[in-house]
């Protein structure tokens, strides 16, 4: 089985395997001892675990737990130590993608082509662990997996799949996704990028500009969407080094600073006909990609939220004011309870959506509902946690302000909070409200 295969792959290649085994053994001993003491002291009524309020753990498969725990070890041991300076210096370390490729977590739901073929829930758990460290790192993985590998797998020819997917899965190639333009954000149908067909040499000439593109300054492969002369919107595979193609970096971001963000500028880029994705000829192509990415985001932001909750809780327990811990304050306890409630509901909704995805029963509106809800709630939680830390809350050494600033961007990209409200509103009423004239 592919799922079992990736578990073995993660365990055999993943750093910190000894730590993971030690942690699992220690946890088992602690749990066993705790149950013995509890049985002696109390009746057998169910106990509440605030770290897993509705027992998510029991609803995951053994492979999903194994994949999550191993990737958590990698994230905490290899990524967490470097994020502080990476964020301060606005640096994305390219080798992270190679490391993820070694772990087998790029394009993980794709079957074959060197990919793991795991469940949608496993993919969500990976996104959650990665964004627990930083949204920028999760963005890089999401783009590679959902916005680059997915369209090649779903809309590409067999030749394109064989050529690109194995290298993308290994992290040997880094990809980006070009849809947003300077004058075309929430309305991609108004894109100005054009593709002119040259019948003489069976190629397309692309002209236009894409902006706010994750990974573009370091990308080897560019999935670009352009309007053709027949009015259809098609996907094109551009390779680094093509004449007329450039990808300048966007500087001065206050969000996602550990992620490389830039533009894609195409000035007469000639693309061979075999680099056109044959299975997409409308906005349904890029929207299908975005739907996959939004699903991962819905999981990921909860990882950031959990970090903020745990940090705020520990700070409230340690910080003494007026002779007592901050956690003694009723307002603090209410805030923690609100955070825990929203995270728990979000996680279990994501679990249900993941199971539906694997049964091909997940409508795009379901994804919009959770992307909108979880991103909005995650941003609220991060802001609240920052406030609970007082003046220390604005120090990046506590990491909460970094999560809060990152989530401002995550709440906006892949469909803004309000755009997803309109998607849901259309489903509820049967009336589209994106424009006034239609």
Curated annotation (Swiss-Prot):
Disulfide bonds: none annotated. GO terms for molecular function: fatty-acyl-CoA binding; flavin adenine dinucleotide binding; glutaryl-CoA dehydrogenase activity. It catalyses: glutaryl-CoA + oxidized [electron-transfer flavoprotein] + 2 H(+) = (2E)-butenoyl-CoA + reduced [electron-transfer flavoprotein] + CO2. It holds the Pfam family Acyl-CoA_dh_N. Strongly inhibited by MCPA-CoA, a metabolite of hypoglycin which is present in unripened fruit of the ackee tree. PROSITE patterns: ACYL_COA_DH_1, ACYL_COA_DH_2. Keywords: Acetylation, Disease variant, FAD, Flavoprotein, Glutaricaciduria, Mitochondrion, Oxidoreductase, Transit peptide. Substrate binds at residues 138-139, 186, 287-294, 415. It is an enzyme of class 1 (oxidoreductase). Its EC number is 1.3.8.6. It is linked to Glutaric aciduria 1: An autosomal recessive metabolic disorder characterized by progressive dystonia and athetosis due to gliosis and neuronal loss in the basal ganglia. Catalyzes the oxidative decarboxylation of glutaryl-CoA to crotonyl-CoA and CO(2) in the degradative pathway of L-lysine, L-hydroxylysine, and L-tryptophan metabolism. It uses electron transfer flavoprotein as its electron acceptor. Isoform Short is inactive. This is Glutaryl-CoA dehydrogenase, mitochondrial. It comes from Homo sapiens.
């Amino acid at each position: 089985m592919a799922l079992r295969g990736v578990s073995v792959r993660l365990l055999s290649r993943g750093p910190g395997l000894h730590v993971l085994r030690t942690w699992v053994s220690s946890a088992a001993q602690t749990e066993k001892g705790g149950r013995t003491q509890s049985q002696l002291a109390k009746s057998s009524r169910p106990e509440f675990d605030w770290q897993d309020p509705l027992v998510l753990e029991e609803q995951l498969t053994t492979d999903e737990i194994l994949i999550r725990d191993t990737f958590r070890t990698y994230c905490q041991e290899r990524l967490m130590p470097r994020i502080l300076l990476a964020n301060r210096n606005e640096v994305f370390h390219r080798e992270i993608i190679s490391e993820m490729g070694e772990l087998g977590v790029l394009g993980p739901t794709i079957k074959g082509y060197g990919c793991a073929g795991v469940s949608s829930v496993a993919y969500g758990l990976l996104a959650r662990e990665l964004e627990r460290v930083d949204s920028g790192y999760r963005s890089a993985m999401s783009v590679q997996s959902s916005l680059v590998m997915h369209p090649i797998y779903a809309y590409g020819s067999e030749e394109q799949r064989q050529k690109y997917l194995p290298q993308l899965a290994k992290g040997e190639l880094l990809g980006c996704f070009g849809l947003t333009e300077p004058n075309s954000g929430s309305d991609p149908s108004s894109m100005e990028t054009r593709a002119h067909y040259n019948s003489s040499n069976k190629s397309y000439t692309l002209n236009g500009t894409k902006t706010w593109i994750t990974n573009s300054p370091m990308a080897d492969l560019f999935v670009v969407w352009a309007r053709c002369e027949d009015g259809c919107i098609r996907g094109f595979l551009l390779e680094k080094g093509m004449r007329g193609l450039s990808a300048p970096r966007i500087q001065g971001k206050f969000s996602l600073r550990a992620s490389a963000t830039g533009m894609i500028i195409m000035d007469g880029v000639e693309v061979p006909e075999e680099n056109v994705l044959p299975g997409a000829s409308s906005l349904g192509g890029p929207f299908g990609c975005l739907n996959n990415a939004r699903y991962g985001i819905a999981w990921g932001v909860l990882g950031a939220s959990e970090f903020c909750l745990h940090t705020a809780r520990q700070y409230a327990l340690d910080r003494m004011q007026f002779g007592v811990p901050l956690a003694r304050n009723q307002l603090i306890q209410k805030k923690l309870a609100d955070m825990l409630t929203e995270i728990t509901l979000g996680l279990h909704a994501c679990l249900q959506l993941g199971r539906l995805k694997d049964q091909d029963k997940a409508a795009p509106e379901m994804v919009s509902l959770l992307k909108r809800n979880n991103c909005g709630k995650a941003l609220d939680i991060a802001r609240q946690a920052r406030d609970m830390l007082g003046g220390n809350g604005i120090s990046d050494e506590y990491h909460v302000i970094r999560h809060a600033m990152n989530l401002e961007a995550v709440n906006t990209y892949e469909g803004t909070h309000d755009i997803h409200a309109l998607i849901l509103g259309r489903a509820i009423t049967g009336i589209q409200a994106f424009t006034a004239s239609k």
